């Protein structure tokens, strides 16, 4: 049996060590470190895959951003879109494959539900539904009372044609007060929407019944 330590070592060999000259920092909590990276590397033009900032190569700026902040959610999304745009698992101007950047994010912060959902979406788009399902199961374990997480899980399940799971996630998000209609409308459009069941009321005896003496 392969140990978790051996798996981590194998992963780091394939997708690189996390230690770097600047970082690694957590995108969720180290916000005070973001400024320099987003000013000089992850600019709006880089995020939208228009042009590079520090060089002519968009991928170099994306790579730097995800080296300093492995779980930078917006940069992960841009990296995924970059691979899709060039129709390649590893664009020529980035250090690792697109999937490696998700692996690095989750190796760095396994509890990052957003990064894990994005990885599930990546797996789904690459026809790897069983793996995507496993990632979403992990997300559900840490979702807590975050209605936005359930809503986004529902959208991914919908893309995977897992309609009952998508419906369950929509109901959970609605029960928590989330009213954005997109997921519901998409389920309605394909005839898969059902309103949440109303909790059944306890059966009570009428006044007349209560007054009737037992025989």
Which ranges hold each PLM region?
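Helix-start (N-cap) detector for alpha-helical repeat units in TPR-like alpha-solenoids
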Residues: 73-74, 113-114, 147-148, 181-182
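Canonical tetratricopeptide repeat
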Residues: 78-81, 118, 152, 186-187
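Canonical positions in the second alpha-helix
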Residues: 64-65, 104-105, 138-139, 172-173
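N-terminal leader/linker segments that initiate helical-solenoid repeat arrays
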Residues: 7-63, 68
